[in-house]
C-alpha cells in the first residue's frame, strides 16, 4: 500500500515504544518477555494501515499480534488505529519483512498472515512473491510444527500460484475459499484493501495452509 509521506511519521512511531518496537532484531527470542505472557503470537506481513491486525488484536485478547510494514507513513496510520483500539496485545515493526529470521527464533511465532501481498505478476519477479518457495522455507523456520499460513488476495493469478506453491512445498491445504465474502466463513476481519474490493463486488480468495 503506497501512500504519501506523512509529516511527523518517524517522530510518531518513536514516541510510542509500548507499541512500536524500533530494534526488533534485539527482540529475537524474547517476544514472550516483551508481551509479558506466553500467549500465542500471530504475525501479519504487510500490515498496511492496520485495520486487520488491530481488529484481530481487539477480537482475540488471548493472542498476541505483530504487524510488519516497511513504509513508515503506512505504519504510522496503523499506529493511529492501535492507539484508538487501546489493547495491550499488539506490537508494530517498521522493517522489511523479507527475512523474518532476523526478528524471530525458530518456532517463536504460531501463525502467519499474508493479506493482499503484491502479486508481482511478471515471471521474472516470481522470486519476490511472498508465497515463493524460498519465503515458505523462511516461514517454516519461525513457525512450529504444523504452523499455519493464512492467505488472502483479490488476485486470481497469485491465488492459483500460491495454491501450487503451498502444495509443492508439501504443505497441507486446510481450507480454500474461492469467494470468501459469499461463503459461511465467520470472524473475517477485513483489511483496507479488502473493504475497497468488497465495495466493488470483487471476489476475495482465501487459503489456510499448514506445514507438515
Curated annotation (Swiss-Prot):
GO terms for cellular component: tRNA methyltransferase complex. Residues 124-129 are annotated as: Interaction with RNA. It catalyses: guanosine(46) in tRNA + S-adenosyl-L-methionine = N(7)-methylguanosine(46) in tRNA + S-adenosyl-L-homocysteine. One of its GO terms (molecular function) is tRNA (guanine(46)-N7)-methyltransferase activity. Substrate binds at residues 122, 154, 191-194. InterPro entries: SAM-dependent_MTases_sf, tRNA_(Gua-N-7)_MeTrfase_Trmb, tRNA_methyltr_TrmB_bact. Its EC number is 2.1.1.33. Pathway: tRNA modification; N(7)-methylguanine-tRNA biosynthesis. The keyword tRNA processing applies. S-adenosyl-L-methionine binds at residues 44, 69, 96, 118. Keywords: Methyltransferase, S-adenosyl-L-methionine, Transferase, tRNA processing. The active site is at 118. Catalyzes the formation of N(7)-methylguanine at position 46 (m7G46) in tRNA. Belongs to the class I-like SAM-binding methyltransferase superfamily. TrmB family. This is tRNA (guanine-N(7)-)-methyltransferase. The gene is trmB.
